[in-house]
Every structure is written in C-alpha cells, then in structure tokens.
C-alpha cells in the first residue's frame, strides 16, 4: 500500500522528463523557425506587391481625346476610302499625374474591332510603314535620314501608311516620331497615338502595300456607326481602356469627329 521509491526509479523519471523537455524545446524552435521564414516570405511578397502597385500608378497613361478624321476622298479616290469612312483614328495621351517616364515604344495596345482582335506595337521605321508615299528625306517619315521643310511634307506619310499590327505616334507638331522620341515625360507633355482604320482589326485589309485605289469600300474601313475597344498597356502593365464609338453620320469630309 506504500510506494517504495528508489534512487533508480527516481533517476529514470528524471531522465524521461528531461527527454520530453528537450523534445518540446526542439519542436518550439522548429515552429519558431517556420514562423520566421513565413514572416520573411510574407514581407517580401508585400514589398513586391507594393512595388507593383506603385508602378501601376506611376506608369499609368491618361487619355485626353479620341478623334477620327473623316476621309476627304470617295472610294476610288487617292486614299481608297469612302466618305462614310475614317482616314485616321487618333488618341491623345499623357502620363498620369506624378507618373514616371513612359516609353510608348514598349507599350502594347490591345484592340477589339469590327474585324477581330489584335495586339499592336509601335511602328518604328519604314519597315513598319507602307512604302507608298515614303520619302526618305522627309522629317514626317519615321526613321528619316535627312531633315527638310516639314511644311512641305504633310502628305508624304499619314495614317494610311501604317501597316497592320502597328500604331504610330505623333508629336505635338503633328509629325510621326521614332521610338526613341515616343516617351511621355516632362519634354513631351502630350503625344498622339495614331491608327490606320483600313487595316485589321479596324478594317478588312491585312497589307497596306496591297491596297490600290477603289479596293476599299464603306464596309471595309472603320467608319460611321462602328465601335472598337482599345486597351493601352504601359510597360509596367498599367492598363487604360478607351471605347471608340463612331457617329452614325459624318457631315463634312476632312472633319474631326469625336469617337
């Protein structure tokens, strides 16, 4: 009825307790290590997310206008478009307030239009523009080799020269620029993104160089009553969406209409 504790028994109990205590310490240490590693990973992810969020704000593009220029020629005329069609689509862009420099040459524009969906990149040089009307001595030409009087070269290159899969960029003087100059910064307060309404996904044409006068008719070119969705994706991934809605009727050839 009485417990007879011996020195050996008490020693065994003490060793067992010590082993349990050591095991508990090891488990606690491992758990602490896991918690520390998890906290470090969460902190790194939070910092990365914060940087991405900052980039999305600091590299966001704002739009100032969306305009279409009504064709001045009938379907069998010089620009191959009917008077119910547009000769040019342009969107004015600036950097959002507080934005860093934004390179439009690294910007992708996703367009869903009457003739499908395409990702467009900036035309930077004559390879991305139709040879028709190309004048290597004109400063209105992207990638020109010599400078001449810009006032005499307005008709050398325009939106109708932009090939499928590309957009062009105009400066504030209305002239196309190379990729190195297509940067929204303190020097370029506003630039204009220009699309060719004849080529996909706005129009039916796939190759500008293959278009001859009279080939395109009212249903072939983006024009009256047509709609398109444009997503401008900056190099950081910030997206600016624009809905283009062409009026049902155009009043005057050559007029600018709000889209």
Swiss-Prot record:
Task: Choose any GO biological process term that the UniProt entry carries and state it.
Answer: archaeal or bacterial-type flagellum-dependent cell motility
Instruction: Report the GO molecular function annotations.
Output: structural molecule activity
> What cellular-component terms does GO give this entry?
archaeal-type flagellum
Which residues make up the pro-peptide? 1-11
InterPro entries with a match to the protein in the record: Flagellin/pilin_N_arc, Flagellin_arc
Major place of residence: other
Query: What role does this protein play?
Result: Flagellin is the subunit protein which polymerizes to form the filaments of archaeal flagella.
PANTHER family named among the record's database cross-references: FLAGELLIN B1
Q: Which NCBIfam families match?
A: arch_flag_Nterm
This one is known as: Flagellin B2
What is the species listed in this Swiss-Prot or TrEMBL entry? Natrialba magadii (strain ATCC 43099 / DSM 3394 / CCM 3739 / CIP 104546 / IAM 13178 / JCM 8861 / NBRC 102185 / NCIMB 2190 / MS3) (Natronobacterium magadii)
Question: Taxonomic lineage per UniProt?
Answer: Archaea, Methanobacteriati, Methanobacteriota, Stenosarchaea group, Halobacteria
């Amino acid at each position: 009825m009485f417990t007879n504790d011996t020195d050996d028994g008490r020693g065994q109990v003490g060793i067992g307790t010590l082993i349990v205590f050591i095991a508990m310490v090891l488990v606690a240490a491992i758990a602490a290590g896991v918690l520390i590693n998890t906290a470090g990973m969460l902190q790194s992810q939070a910092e990365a997310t914060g940087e991405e969020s900052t980039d999305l704000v600091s590299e966001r593009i704002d739009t100032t206008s969306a305009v279409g220029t009504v064709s001045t020629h009938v379907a069998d005329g010089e620009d191959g478009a009917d008077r119910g069609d547009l000769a040019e689509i342009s969107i004015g862009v600036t950097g959002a307030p507080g934005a860093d420099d934004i390179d439009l040459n690294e910007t992708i524009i996703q367009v869903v239009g009457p003739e499908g969906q395409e990702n467009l990149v900036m035309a930077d040089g004559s390879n991305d523009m139709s040879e028709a009307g190309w004048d290597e001595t004109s400063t209105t030409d992207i990638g020109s080799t010599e400078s001449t009087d810009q006032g005499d070269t307005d008709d050398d290159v325009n939106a109708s020269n932009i090939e499928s899969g590309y957009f062009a960029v105009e400066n504030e003087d209305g002239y196309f620029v190379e990729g190195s100059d297509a940067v929204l910064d303190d020097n370029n307060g506003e630039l204009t993104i220009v699309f060719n309404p004849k080529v996909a996904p706005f129009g039916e044409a796939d190759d500008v160089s293959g278009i001859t006068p009279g080939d395109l008719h009212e249903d072939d070119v983006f024009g009256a009553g047509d709609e398109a969705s444009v997503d401008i994706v900056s190099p950081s991934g910030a997206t600016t969406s624009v809905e283009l809605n062409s009026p049902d009727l155009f009043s005057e050839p050559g007029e600018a209409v709000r889209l």
